Amino acid sequence: MSNQDLVLLERLENGAAVVTLNSPKVNALSTQLLGRLLEVAQELTATPAGAVVITGGDRLFAAGADISQFGGADDARNIGAAFHAALNAVADIPAMVIAAVSGYALGGGCELALACDYRIASTKAVFGQPEILLGIIPGGGGTQRLPRVVGASRAKELMVTGRQVKAEEAVRIGLADEVVEPEELMVRALELAGTISSGATVAVRIIKRVVNEGIETDIASGLAGELAAFEEVFRTEDSQVGVKSFLENGPGKAAFTGQ
């Protein structure tokens, strides 16, 4: 299998895109797969989609790093760098990124889900950071992104025990945002991606950017960023279309152009 086939990118007619992890058996996140994921994320940044769905297929999301590539400290540095480059690129995709988690999302797979903006879990989904069971720590962003999602105390508990979290608990603690039956997973993910893609996608990208920047700074700086972005969005064609449509036809009827 070529590196190109390890991660597939499909652009849909409605403007959304689907990214499919396609590594044999368990979608082990090898450095080769991560390199291809980085390329795909960079393409989705250079030529944005309306929204992005990341899936590992019907059976699982991703079972974690490719343990066969683990060796000494030099290997760890290279693997960690590959994870950071790829997952940071996923997090930096301008569009909303939706993780459709069908089964196991463990280790690096959980870290990939955490790099997404919204996580939809199948009832069969299982999340976890089990690195402690190998005597190591998460190296793909887990020590930083997991506390930001579930809080520091819960994140520490999950990482120091390595325990697995099923879908219902994942929603309860904020690790997943909603749970659906397995056969409804991609239907729901594509429905949400389609809804976002049919809306004011420039404003969507601005919302994502301002929220992400704001949670990393103090409230005053965040509000200043919001004010600048509020002015910025009023320069878009979509804002003119939306306001005009609201005044003439009421809410929810604007035909946005993405400009």
Model feature map: region roles:
Residues 1-55, 88:
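Conserved CoA-thioester-binding segment of acyl-CoA-metabolizing enzymes
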Residues 26-27, 60, 178:
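Short strand->helix junction
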Residues 6, 33-39, 47, 56-89, ...:
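Glycine- (often His-adjacent) and acidic-residue-rich active-site loop
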Residues 41, 61, 93, 127, ...:
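Conserved hydrophobic/aromatic "anchor" residues
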Residues 1-14, 23, 44-47, 162-168, ...:
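C-terminal alpha-helix plus adjacent terminal tail
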Residues 19, 37, 54, 66, ...:
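Terminal peptide-recognition signature
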Residues 91-202, 232, 236, 241-244:
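Crotonase-fold acyl-CoA enzyme core
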Residues 34, 54, 67, 83, ...:
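A general structural signal for well-ordered alpha-helical segments in protein cores
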